[in-house]
Regions:
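Sec-dependent bacterial lipoprotein signal peptides
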Residues: 1-18
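Chymotrypsin/trypsin-fold serine protease catalytic domain
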Residues: 23, 131-219, 256, 262-266
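Conserved catalytic-core segment of clan PA serine endopeptidases
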Residues: 33-44, 58, 88-159, 204
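Short Gly/Pro-enriched turn/cap motifs at secondary-structure boundaries
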Residues: 40-42, 125-128, 186-187, 219-224
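Short, hydrophobic/aromatic-rich segments at coil-to-beta transitions
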Residues: 44-51, 168, 210-211
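Short beta-strand segments that buttress and anchor functional surface loops
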Residues: 51-55, 214-216
Length: 274
């Protein structure tokens, strides 16, 4: 799976970063990275992870991933919720295999739930999406999960103690592309997971808002369509970060994820959990 793409240089607005989100809902013409690469079929391992469809002018246009953190609340990336008025509607598909759902990408199916509202961080802008890349989707109907299956938020500053190491492992989950290169695209709408490790934190172009994780054949990683999906801390249900951006159009090398352990992020998401 792959997120938005980013060039590893912190330009004035870092607009060269590629968001890993919003691949077109029609998999035949993907535009941004969206799936887990070199990953494993998830099955029912992470039932809180859902596929999100975003409509423009009433028609399905893009897709992302997200995590159910309360029965009617889905956590995702800011660029998946968009700026005010950017999307006319959102819905989720809460099944592991959306590829064979005959209702996709339209509403009304047994595994779809329509959104009543969606919000990105109040400081989010598309032009500098990576700085405040978190959003929520509010659902019209509850997702049925057991209490231990919902994604949970980290404590403030929890990730600061992490050290770049092959032993600092995350579980990335999403519905993004499995492979993309100049001659081949594999874009099955199936929930998958990978186990990337921490490459960079609190330094370089990631700043204090992102982590850089591995993305290779050994660890797997994210791609277009995985945007907004969770990067769980180890094998826990704690969502350390949401998939945000990629470094290149092939979804290879490293991937950027937006940290959730910052106070302003926790305050923003927390208001929808009260």
């Amino acid at each position: 799976m792959r997120p938005r793409l980013v060039i590893p240089v912190l330009a004035a607005a870092c607009v060269s970063l590629l968001s890993c989100d919003r691949v077109p809902s029609d998999l035949r013409s993907p535009g941004r990275p969206s799936f887990i690469t070199d990953g494993t079929l998830d099955g029912n391992a992470h039932p809180a992870v859902v596929l999100i469809i975003m409509d423009i002018a009433g028609k399905p246009a893009f897709r992302c991933s997200g995590t159910v953190i309360a029965p009617k609340v889905v956590l995702t990336a800011g660029h998946c919720a968009g700026e005010p008025g950017e999307f006319s509607g959102l819905r989720i598909f809460n099944e592991a295999d959306v590829q064979h759902d005959p209702t996709y990408p339209n509403p009304g199916g047994p595994n779809t739930i329509e959104a009543t509202a969606w919000h990105s961080h109040p400081l989010f802008t598309e032009s500098a999406f990576f700085l405040h890349d978190v959003g929520v989707v509010l659902l019209s109907k509850a997702v049925k999960l057991s209490s231990g299956q919902f994604g949970t938020l980290p404590a403030a500053g929890q990730l600061d103690a992490l050290k770049p190491s092959s032993a600092t492992v995350f579980t990335a989950v999403g519905y993004g592309l499995q492979e993309i290169n100049p001659v081949h695209i594999e874009a099955l709408r199936i929930r998958m997971f990978a186990e990337p490790h921490l490459i960079q934190i609190n330094t370089g172009f990631t700043g204090s808002f992102s982590l850089l994780l591995s993305n290779n054949a050994s660890t797997g990683g994210t791609c277009f369509g995985d945007s907004g999906g969770p990067n769980y801390l180890g094998s826990s249900n704690t969502i350390a970060a949401v998939t945000s951006f990629g470094i290149n159009g092939n979804c290879a090398g490293t991937g950027g994820v937006f940290r959730l352990d910052k106070k302003d992020v926790l305050d923003f998401v927390g208001q929808y959990l009260k």
